[in-house]
């Protein structure tokens, strides 16, 4: 816990973390580990469901290992060997690359279980969790405009009551809704990509698949004489518990974005999959649900006036592959390190330390996300996507390079030629 000398009598914690998803729980864990008094506020109660593909690349697994989470299969994880890519009449299995910086396996776990695992980990290290607490806006100092706390409601039904909490630093981990940022007038950038994903679970014999599977082409073959290419991309991730997570995503660079029924689109694709996979309504375990994917730093600045934006609240989903969990967790680690350094200084010296957070994000992801924006614009053109699928998939070496690029899996030093090319491109690209 934090020392009393750093916390003023009127303050409820040294750091308030709003949202107990991967970003919030990761930040709370590292902050508590650093000896700070952390208040973690979550609008729901655990366990709770989140719309997600549930699949982690080695980048995500690394964050779990760094956090101290047991990632063995005996601990409830289903490991995978790599990515299976399907498109253009080709099916290609690509093993995760062997790297110094990342493990050589991915993992799958339902978000309902995953998020609770992370938040309990944070609690064990000393973070104080308040569930059923919906934070709606920031409290600002009338003189300086600095964020000094948050306000909202706690409880349900007739027990609901207004609440407010105060701390010298607040971490906004409140997801795509970004209520705290919006309460300060921080809107999203329209020049950044946005995606939408929908998914459903099915009881299926494919539950123990040892690869994450990505479909680059989604076909509606209900009329065999006139097959139609549907917009978007699909995934099939075995969960290891008898079920499979099946979903699709679509980017706002597609002409179909916002103009189609995404749930119907998913059904159109799945009705053309083999019967034995059981991707039919009678085998569903829950209804189709969807969520937005804020990409490429679509909300900035990531630090201002005592408020840090983490994960989806700061638009940190990878534009290349729609992956959000690793970047949410990494932003939690960055934010916690900067916050710990800042809060051990005198108040008049903290701002300089806190300004290191957005700089660290830009250095780590800025050039990569700029390349991602270019990639998203290109694949939004169906003809470009068709050509990439037709001529790219049969070339294994090219696809190995593509896997490293899309999953952001390279060694920064002493990597192979592919690593050097990717790292060089990200350094040359202007920061997002």
Name the predicted role of every residue range:
Residues 45-65:
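Conserved N-terminal glycine-rich FAD pyrophosphate-binding loop of Rossmann-like flavoproteins
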Residues 121-278:
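Predominantly flavin-linked oxidoreductase catalytic cores and closely associated redox partners
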Residues 340-432:
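C-terminal helical "tail/cap" subdomain of flavin- and related membrane-associated enzymes
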Residues 61, 66-116:
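A conserved beta-strand/loop capping segment in the N-terminal third of enzymes
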Residues 32-52:
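Glycine-rich FAD pyrophosphate-binding loop
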Residues 6-23:
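Beta1/beta-strand and adjacent pyrophosphate-binding region of the FAD-binding site
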Residues 23, 46, 177:
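Conserved Rossmann-like nucleotide-cofactor binding loop
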Residues 76, 135, 252-338, 344-347:
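FAD/FMN-dependent oxidoreductases across multiple families
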